């Protein structure tokens, strides 16, 4: 095991114990950076915040919505200070620093913590999973991501275009856009896996196609849809809890947006169920195709061995070279032997063809 993998695993185990100090237990090495976006109906501006300026209560403007984007979780001390400054417990910092933590929604007085995992396909068409946490208050939103990938680029575009009058609304609508980005990635990933599995099914149904690596592809995409299901199913359960919160963040006028997000989550879960059924049928189909190919190979081997059994017998008899073998002294004995073997092979071949033709007619 490589050293960094051992370190991540050791830190992950350490985070499972009660402590006053926790570590980032993921694999990303992104340095912790903070970007602050402040907006209201009249203005919108973004700036970088130094990692030492983690007193967000002083940086926040009460007349604007303050969105702090924390990218990179390697500076665990800074993350812990941010959480404490937000009025939460050390254990909440542990949840933020521990990737693949169970999805949860925790409601506090006037604030809320959402811990979840997102997955998406990168530029190399490989599925990636990222641990994301969101702290929300009336006029403050703090997002924590493992890397500096533009996970919430769609939310920034919505702010620039003032989509759905987002700059006029409170932090609840910004939270809806953030969750929409995460759920949209789940929808896109689930739909892509389903499409790939359907393409594999078409390949397996056509015996002319090369099916050499189909087994590994089925296993790979089975693992991918399991990741999606693992991230979406708990989120749907916690989403109902999110809609029942009474901290005033999710106001009645934006509740339909959250209901739509819940419908999208239901679509993701239904798609993963479809992927599960397709994968199960693909495994059966792949095994069946392997059996058919094995039967075809055995059939060819049987034909070859049947052809050579009588020829081997004749060659074995004439190869004994006993003194009393009249055909050895015949003038044309060699040519007669060849003629007998060729005739035997041809007759055997005709018999095999006739036999398989009659079997096919019976079927």
Please state what every model-predicted region is:
Residues 266-305:
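Membrane-interface, cytosolic juxtamembrane amphipathic helix immediately N-terminal to a transmembrane helix
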Residues 293-326, 335-345:
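Bilayer-spanning, highly hydrophobic alpha-helical transmembrane segments
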Residues 1-244, 249-251, 257-260, 264-269, ...:
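Peripheral, non-transmembrane regulatory/ligand-interaction domains of membrane transport proteins
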Residues 348-355:
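Membrane-helix cytosolic exit motif
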Residues 356-363:
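Conserved small/polar residues in nucleotide/adenosyl-binding loops
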Residues 84, 316, 353:
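Short polybasic/polar patches that bind polyanions
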Residues 287, 322-325, 354:
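Juxtamembrane transmembrane-helix termini
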């Amino acid at each position: 095991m490589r050293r960094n993998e051992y370190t991540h695993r050791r830190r992950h185990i350490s985070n499972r114990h009660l402590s006053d100090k926790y570590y980032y237990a993921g694999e990303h090495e992104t340095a912790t950076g903070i970007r602050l976006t402040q907006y209201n109906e009249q203005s919108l501006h973004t700036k970088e915040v130094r990692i030492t300026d983690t007193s967000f209560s002083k940086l926040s403007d009460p007349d604007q919505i303050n969105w702090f984007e924390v990218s990179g979780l390697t500076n665990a001390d800074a993350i812990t200070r941010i959480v404490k400054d937000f009025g939460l417990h050390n254990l909440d910092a542990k949840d933020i620093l521990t990737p693949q933590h169970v999805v949860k929604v925790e409601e506090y007085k006037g604030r809320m913590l959402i811990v979840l995992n997102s997955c998406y396909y990168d530029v190399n068409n490989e599925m990636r999973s990222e641990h994301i946490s969101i702290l929300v208050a009336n006029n403050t939103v703090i997002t924590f991501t493992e890397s500096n990938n533009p996970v919430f680029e769609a939310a920034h575009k919505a702010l620039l275009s003032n989509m759905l009058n987002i700059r006029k609304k409170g932090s609840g609508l910004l939270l809806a856009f953030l969750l929409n980005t995460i759920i949209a990635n789940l929808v896109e990933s689930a739909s892509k896996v389903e499409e790939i599995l359907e393409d594999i099914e078409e390949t397996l149904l056509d015996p002319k196609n090369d099916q050499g690596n189909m087994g590994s592809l089925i296993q790979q995409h089975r693992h991918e849809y399991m990741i999606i299901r693992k991230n979406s199913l708990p989120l749907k359960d916690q989403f109902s809890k999110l809609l029942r919160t009474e901290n005033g963040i999710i106001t009645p006028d934006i509740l339909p947006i959250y209901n739509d997000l819940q419908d999208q989550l239901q679509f993701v879960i239904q798609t993963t169920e479809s992927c599960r059924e397709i994968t199960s049928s693909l495994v059966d189909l792949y095994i069946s195709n392997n059996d058919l190919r094995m039967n075809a190979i055995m059939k060819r081997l049987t034909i070859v061995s049947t052809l050579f059994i009588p020829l081997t017998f004749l060659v074995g008899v004439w190869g004994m070279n006993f003194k009393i073998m009249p055909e050895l002294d015949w003038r044309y004995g060699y040519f007669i032997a060849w003629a007998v073997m060729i005739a035997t092979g041809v007759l055997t071949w005709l018999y095999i063809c006739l036999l398989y033709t009659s079997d096919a007619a019976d079927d």
